[in-house]
Regions:
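Bacterial N-terminal signal peptides that target proteins for export
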Residues: 1-12
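Intrinsically disordered, low-complexity terminal tails and linkers in eukaryotic proteins, enriched
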Residues: 23-76, 96-197
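C-terminal motif of bacterial Sec signal peptides marking the signal peptidase cleavage site
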Residues: 18-21
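Beta-strand cores of secreted/periplasmic/IMS beta-sandwich domains, seen most often
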Residues: 72-90
């Protein structure tokens, strides 16, 4: 079988491949107050925050709990799953109280103006706020200097990331326009290891 590449055959294929990568752009940019947000499309819902983790459980049970797709609420075009009807009721009464910082992106990534995805099971409550991290190494690096890292993350979230397209922001800040204090994963891991000695 011979595949012919023609101008009219190549353009639709190229366009289809390019658009296939657009789903996360739409999913993570719902508009409104929660944009961008660490969300995925799942269970027939366009934007499920933190892959369905129950955001209320972090606050009320000090625990990561996976939510149930049958117990859900929508706030600012983002779907939230809950592990119980009680948690859903708490969220519905006061949703902003239970929102993760930085749209649920890795808090340590936001220190560098980079909205990396966070893992719902790697988290920390600090002063009544929920911080999500991309992994234990990211969490440990953030915790080395919480006041400084929160100040930087708040600054970059409010000045650059909030309201932006997460993909574009991530691409720019990891390639051509790094912040002056940028550190690689290896550099952060070395700092964490030295602090544990």
């Amino acid at each position: 079988m011979r595949i012919q590449s023609t101008l009219f055959g190549t353009i639709p294929l190229t366009l289809a491949l390019a658009l296939a990568g657009c789903a996360p752009l739409v999913t993570q940019s719902p508009g409104g107050k929660l944009s961008p947000v660490n969300a995925v499309a799942m269970d027939g819902n366009d934007r499920v925050i933190l892959k369905g983790a129950d955001v209320v459980a972090y606050f009320t049970q000090n625990a990561y709990k996976q939510g149930n797709p049958a117990i859900k609420s929508t706030y600012e075009n983002v779907t939230f799953y809950f592990s119980s009807a009680e948690n859903k009721a708490l969220f519905d009464k006061e949703p902003t109280r239970y929102l993760p910082e930085f749209g649920g992106y890795c808090a340590n990534g936001i220190v560098y103006a980079i909205p990396w995805g966070g893992d719902a099971d790697t988290w920390r409550m600090l002063d009544g706020k929920l911080y999500i991290f991309g992994g234990a190494g990211s969490r440990d690096a953030f915790l080395l200097d919480v006041p400084r890292n929160r100040q930087l993350a708040d600054k970059y979230w409010n000045e650059e990331v909030k309201g932006s397209n997460a993909f574009t922001q991530r691409t720019l800040r990891t390639t051509v326009n790094r912040v002056a204090h940028y550190k690689s994963g290896a550099e952060l891991a070395a700092e964490v290891a030295a602090a544990k000695k």
